């Protein structure tokens, strides 16, 4: 178990960091959480995801997994591994898509040799919890049932990291590894984000009230399916975590690592200085993220050889 600290050094990632910072500095059109602001956010997030180039030699196909839409990415030559990656995109539960994240999914498929399924869960606020969570859960159950000899790795960023951790807790018997990029794990406003991000409006205002209307609905924010902060970390599959040093969700990422350490779960964490939230999903587009991609793919493969799922 270890926490590895790295710095942004390449012009490629430096430029992307500056671009993200400039975008975040712009005022939001409409009251945040309004229909207009959500549409603007969806456009902006989709544009960012689509800016990541698709990996060569990877094909895509639309599939259905127990009624849940997904996009399968696999190499033209066919997968070289029986194992499966399930990628769940981020976007604050209200934006992003499997279609927009083909660049990152294709990098996962090419580097790992695994079939990579990107889940096209239904966004909020069109639906509220637990619709999207259950869609992801049903997809995992379908893949596990149809592929009994395959290890399944969950990869998620931000809101997708929330889903991935909560799903791994729910299906410890079916998940062999979890890779989390800047996960958000607490909507009960219990975790101390101000400790690491004292100037962040998100840390100051909390997430509970905002997401109560947009995602949580009338459910308890301390439900582990909503806030895996409150979940059961015992016997969790091995976890690899990435985040930026100065982002507001650093506290969330660190908490997951420390809980893994407490329960003796195999875990690694990479903290980047000078990047941005969920920077790892840039994939092969920068030297730092390409190296990181190789690191967590190697972690996954090592885990899949040594980690035995309890039957």
Locations of the language-model features?
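Alpha/beta-hydrolase superfamily serine-hydrolase fold, recognizing
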Residues: 28, 65-71, 76-311
